[in-house]
Amino acid sequence: MGFPIPDPYVWDPSFRIFYSIIDDEHKTLFNGIFHLGHDDSADNLAELRRCTGKHFLNEQVLMQDSQYAGYAEHVRAHDGFIHQLDNWHGDVKWAKNWLVNHIKTIDFKYKGKI
């Protein structure tokens, strides 16, 4: 069972990783998915894809620089999300659920390690 999806769908302190750049990027991803839920336009999807790619790259560089042991697992999770965005079928509920659970399970594993 996953974590509850916030309503309204906004970042809150329970998602804090304690790396300001990552927390700020997570806020941007929440915002992007929120907007996509209200307007499933190609422009909103493209903006979410752009922000997601930038965030994943930044996170992966931090993990590589610190030789984080969970790097490969983390990249696989990122690749799966990107694949879903690149083959988008309008499932905003899935995207909301993925981000919440990714942060609170996968991202929380690197707290204090990168």
From Swiss-Prot:
Report whether Translocase shows up as a keyword of the record. no
Q: Where does Fe cation 2 bind?
A: 59, 74, 78, 102, 107
Q: Name one GO molecular function term.
A: iron ion binding
Instruction: Give the UniProt keywords, A-Z.
Output: Iron, Metal-binding, Oxygen transport, Transport
Enumerate the SUPFAM superfamilies for this protein.
Answer: Hemerythrin-like (SSF47188)
Residues where Fe cation 1 binds = 26, 55, 59, 107
Transcription keyword on record? no
| Pfam families for this protein | Hemerythrin
UniProt lists the family membership as follows: Belongs to the hemerythrin family.
Alphabetical list of PANTHER family matching this protein: BACTERIOHEMERYTHRIN (PTHR37164:SF1)
| Its job | Hemerythrin is a respiratory protein in blood cells of certain marine worms. The oxygen-binding site in each chain contains two iron atoms.
Q: What is this protein called?
A: Hemerythrin subunit 2
